[in-house]
């Protein structure tokens, strides 16, 4: 394993990297991982610092981020505001404080949920959201380290529209494209 300092949005973190940890570019369980060990940064481009040109989506969407880790919330919020500069992004660190009702969640276009949280998990929140017909237009995206085939199948059964693997270090255009696909599917792009 190689330990490399990686500059992140909120400061200097250390990332442990091995070829078996390579992110795949799809939610497919059958993806083949081809590793070229010449450039570690090509495997883990920072979504906030990559040099890839993209056009931000200027629609005033409303997003809810639920994660028990404050640093994850800050990083993901900053990334979303880079991709959607006119969006409203609310963060919640206490999963138990998320009231799941039409009145409280219907104004969100998309909810990003960490899966492993104390008290109330992301899968429990997703199950409750999807059990309410009134919240069908709200998109759900899992953001998690649990990314095995069985996990992805469970998230799909629970009604998640997509899953990002943590750390979220995909190319910016890929993240933007996947979020826009969920927005189009769930709410028809409505603002």
UniProtKB/Swiss-Prot annotation:
InterPro entries: CheY-like_superfamily, Sig_transdc_resp-reg_receiver, ST_Response_Regulator. Required for stress adaptation, morphogenesis and virulence. The keyword Phosphoprotein applies. PANTHER family: TWO-COMPONENT RESPONSE REGULATOR, TWO-COMPONENT RESPONSE REGULATOR ARR22. The modification 4-aspartylphosphate is found at residue 114. It comes from the Eukaryota. Gene3D superfamilies: 3.40.50.2300. The keyword Phosphoprotein applies. Keywords: Phosphoprotein. SMART domains: REC. This is Stress response regulator protein 1. Residues 62-181 form the Response regulatory domain. Transmembrane segments: none annotated. The lineage of its organism: Eukaryota, Fungi, Dikarya, Ascomycota, Saccharomycotina. One of its GO terms (biological process) is filamentous growth of a population of unicellular organisms in response to biotic stimulus.
């Amino acid at each position: 394993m190689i330990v490399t300092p990686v500059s992140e949005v909120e400061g200097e973190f250390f990332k442990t990297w091995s070829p078996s940890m390579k992110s795949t570019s799809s939610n497919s369980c059958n993806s083949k991982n081809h590793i070229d060990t010449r450039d570690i940064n090509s495997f883990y481009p920072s979504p906030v610092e990559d040099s890839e040109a993209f056009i931000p989506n200027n629609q005033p969407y409303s997003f809810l981020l639920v994660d028990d880790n404050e640093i994850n919330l800050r990083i993901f919020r900053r990334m979303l505001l880079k991709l959607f500069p006119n969006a409203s992004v609310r963060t919640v660190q206490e999963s138990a404080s998320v009231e799941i009702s039409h009145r409280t969640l219907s104004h969100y276009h998309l909810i990003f949920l960490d899966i492993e949280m104390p008290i109330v998990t992301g899968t429990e929140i997703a199950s409750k959201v999807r059990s309410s017909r009134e919240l069908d237009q709200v998109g759900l995206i899992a953001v998690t380290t649990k990314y095995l085939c069985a996990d992805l199948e469970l998230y799909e059964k629970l009604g998640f529209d997509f899953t990002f693997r943590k750390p979220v270090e995909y190319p910016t255009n890929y993240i933007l494209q996947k979020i826009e696909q969920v927005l189009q599917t769930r709410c028809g792009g409505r603002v």
